[in-house]
Regions:
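Conserved metal-binding segment of the jelly-roll/cupin
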Residues: 94-115
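Non-catalytic, conserved peripheral segments adjacent to functional cores
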Residues: 1-95, 116-118
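N-terminal secretory/targeting leader peptides
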Residues: 120-123
């Protein structure tokens, strides 16, 4: 089990996608695999070459799970915890549809959109 509150770096996840003749079903979040209390769920759409970020919440910091529903992005995550050994370290991830990223609350986050249409879900 991944306990999000204990993470000290981002983690890329490959989600399980079940496909058949009708289409597909993707397990985005399973509580038995990831211990995570989220306060909201939002979707973001971005066209090709859009850059978003670097975002973080200072007063009400929160962990995030980012899931790519459609498209491809280059995701950048930066450690902003000043007393951390890895303060300022940048992590880069290329995420495609069906992949997710867990981002600890002490990290800023941004991405560039690579596909014509990109749809992301945040928890």
């Amino acid at each position: 089990m991944i306990v999000v509150s204990k993470l000290n770096k981002p983690i890329k996840l490959k989600q399980v996608i079940h496909k058949d003749l009708r289409g597909s079903l993707t397990e985005i979040f399973l509580r038995k695999k990831i211990k995570f209390n989220f306060c909201k769920c939002i979707t973001v759409t971005s066209k090709k070459n859009v850059i978003r970020g670097l975002h973080f919440q200072k007063k009400f910091a929160q962990h995030k799970i980012l899931f790519v529903l459609k498209g491809t992005i280059n995701d950048f995550v930066v450690n902003i915890k000043k007393n951390s050994k890895t303060y300022g370290k940048v992590y880069k991830f290329k995420l495609t549809a069906g992949e997710a990223l867990i981002i600890p609350k002490t990290f800023a986050h941004g991405y560039s959109s690579l596909a014509k249409e990109n749809i992301l879900i945040y928890f």
